[in-house]
Design a protein with these regions (language model features):
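Membrane-embedded beta-strand positions of outer-membrane beta-barrel proteins
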Residues: 40, 87, 164, 179-183
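Flexible loop and strand-edge segments within Gram-negative outer membrane beta-barrel domains
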Residues: 3-43, 47-51, 62-141, 153-156, ...
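Short, Φ-rich (hydrophobic/aromatic) sequence segments
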Residues: 175-177
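Surface-exposed, low-complexity/disordered Ser/Thr/Gly/Pro/Asn-rich loops and linkers
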Residues: 145-148
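Short, solvent-exposed loop/turn segments enriched in Ser/Thr/Gly
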Residues: 159-161
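Short glycine-enriched, charge-decorated loop/helix-capping segments at active-site entrances
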Residues: 55-61
Length: 190
């Protein structure tokens, strides 16, 4: 077929979608009594993939994506008229999907989308094989093949943040004097 022998590829169109969806939803709850005030929040974030999806016949979908859920809870207990105990808990769980062994500084797919000549090869030929340019002297790499065949990696990150505060108003001894003790613990698991 002539289009396979003499390709004219818009690599940006072949590699990227017109747009990527991103959304964020959250729910907050607050209230309290004379003894306790509370605030709670849950948030979900989804970042879609800008790269087009191609069948790689390997049983997985390569590409990019990110999902994260956050939670927060703040409780303020009025133990006495002059003593307040505060508990603040927050955490998140995130999953980042990338092609296997992809780093944050790897821009090769972007570079080749704008640098590969339109007549170098087709992204995918009619027999299902990916285009390949044997001499890479002109920077002709097939980013469609790279993204589709590079595997898929999911990196999870879990964060837990806590702080506990005890405040004692000593205004009865010295006007405006308050003593505060704070304990906090932050953990990140990757």
């Amino acid at each position: 077929e002539e289009s396979e022998r003499y390709p004219n590829v818009d690599w940006v169109d072949a590699l990227f979608k017109d747009y990527a969806m991103s959304y964020n939803a959250n729910v907050n709850l607050s209230g309290g009594t004379s003894f306790v005030k509370y605030f709670a929040s849950v948030d979900f974030l989804n970042e879609g993939d800008l790269f087009r999806e191609y069948d790689n016949s390997r049983g997985y979908q390569a590409g990019f994506g990110y999902n994260r859920i956050n939670g927060r809870s703040n409780l303020d207990f009025n133990l006495t008229k002059t003593t307040v105990f505060k508990v603040n808990l927050s955490g998140s769980y995130g999953v980042r999907k990338t092609p296997w062994d992809y780093s944050d500084t790897d821009y090769s797919a972007w570079i080749s989308a704008y640098g590969t000549p339109p007549d170098a090869m087709l992204p995918i030929y009619s027999d299902g094989s990916f285009g390949y340019y044997s001499k890479d002297e002109v920077g002709a790499s097939n980013s469609v093949m790279s993204v589709a065949l590079s595997g898929a990696e999911e990196r999870t990150t879990t964060r837990i943040n806590t702080d506990f505060t005890l405040e004692q108003d000593l205004g009865m001894l010295v006007k405006g004097l308050t003593v505060r003790g704070l304990f906090s613990l932050d953990n990140t698991f990757i």
